[in-house]
Amino acid sequence: MKSAVENLSPTRVKLDVEVPFEELQPSIAEAYKTIAEQVQIPGFRKGKFPNRLIDQRVGRGYVLETAINEGLNGWYQNAVAETGLRPLSRPEVEITEVPDPAATDGELKFKVEVDVRPEVELPDYAGITVEVAPAEQSDEDRQKALDDLRGRFGTLKPADRPAAKDDFITIDINAKIADEDVDSATGLSYQVGAGTMLEGLDEAVEGLSTDEEAIFDTKLVGGEHAGEAAQVTVKLTAVKVRELPEADDDFAQLASEFDTIAELREDLVKQVNQSKTVEQGVEARDKVMEKLVELIEVPIPESVIEEQLEQHFDPANAHGEEDHDTEEHRVEVRENTERAFKNEIILDAVADKEEISVSQAELIDYIVNSASQYGMDPNQFAQMLDQSGQVPMVVSEVRRRKALAHVLGLATVTDTEGAAVDLSDFVKPAVDPELEAALNEAAGVTGEDDDTEAEEERVTVSADDPGAARF
């Protein structure tokens, strides 16, 4: 098989492929088997008759057409591997020449146009300089941390007064469209100001006393009338306030491992400091990424962006939002999509240059942390990723994070007061030693066999996921 590439643009190529007759033969043989299972010839068992009878029944041309249709994707994938292309989109195929069905020689020729990952030229990214806010904590930060902890142990007490922001209320609601009842619910619990129910609800209930009602106009967000304008009547049936426990030694013993409130406060100072340090690290990471994007020109394949936009604005994804597809929203989503594309291309290029790989321990550590964020069992989360074919995507994500951490480690980061910022915790993420030991034990890695060190198992999934061609 021969293949040649013509660059149409930095993100699009034309691939010319020639498949000699001898390489068509396996597909032709498979085509005969496929057709033999689909036709019936008197006097022969299904699938058990000579090829010449199939030629007589359906025609040699149909056999050749079937062979080409079944083999085309494989030849395309072979050409992609042979030329080192990294496709991003579905290929557009044009068959330009087929062998004469009556002949025993000839070539199959076809052309493919497809969007590919652009090549980028990396600058010297060592020593990128960025400035971030100081990791300082205030008295308000420390008090908020304590109050948040007290809130977790608070109790709700009835309040004999009108509802106010942050109160916990119980309500009944009824929705009407054109004076017709379309939905209702009773005994709903809600925190005033949360903004998690209907738009306009917070304003309607503030100031209401028990057994009072208010009427407001809004758009429904669920059910068969989602997105439709409705008139909603809300009745307040109870008001409660959260009563916080006293911040004393008893509370410290209840809410923590400490015996005194002084020890708890000291630990909260450490937690707030850690939180501020993380915020500072995130700011540095984001600014380093912004600098990379400024320094590196990344061509963007328009068709890939358009496909993602269409997926985002598919009516099935509107979730009842009438204003889901607006010009303003499209501009915002396009900008975010293009930014994400640039980030991926740049970080993949850095990972390639630095020969960054992903260890099994790093992959599972990422899965465990992600599962925790979703409140899922890590094993179930990993199984879900595997069944949905998302493991390569996760590997790529971890690899890009490591690439960005590498660049961040080479950067010069100072705060706005001129002090150097230590980002060692961000650029050298440590895998839990117990987790790594367990993984190695499960894999049979001991480091003692034949007096040689066992190398850490590495995930060898490709960072590319062009998908199979569909014609």
Swiss-Prot record:
Residues 442-471 are annotated as: Disordered. The gene is tig. GO terms for molecular function: peptidyl-prolyl cis-trans isomerase activity; protein folding chaperone; ribosome binding. Its EC number is 5.2.1.8. The keyword Hydrolase does not apply. This is Trigger factor. It catalyses: [protein]-peptidylproline (omega=180) = [protein]-peptidylproline (omega=0). Residues 166-245 form the PPIase FKBP-type domain. The keyword Chaperone applies. Keywords: Cell cycle, Cell division, Chaperone, Cytoplasm, Isomerase, Rotamase. Consists of 3 domains; the N-terminus binds the ribosome, the middle domain has PPIase activity, while the C-terminus has intrinsic chaperone activity on its own. Involved in protein export. Acts as a chaperone by maintaining the newly synthesized protein in an open conformation. Functions as a peptidyl-prolyl cis-trans isomerase. Belongs to the FKBP-type PPIase family. Tig subfamily. InterPro entries: PPIase_dom_sf, Trig_fac, Trigger_fac_C, Trigger_fac_C_sf, Trigger_fac_ribosome-bd_bac, Trigger_fac_ribosome-bd_sf, Trigger_fact/SurA_dom_sf. PANTHER family: TRIGGER FACTOR CHAPERONE AND PEPTIDYL-PROLYL CIS/TRANS ISOMERASE, TRIGGER FACTOR-LIKE PROTEIN TIG, CHLOROPLASTIC. It is an enzyme of class 5 (isomerase). GO terms for biological process: 'de novo' cotranslational protein folding; cell division; chaperone-mediated protein folding; protein transport; protein unfolding. It comes from the Bacteria.
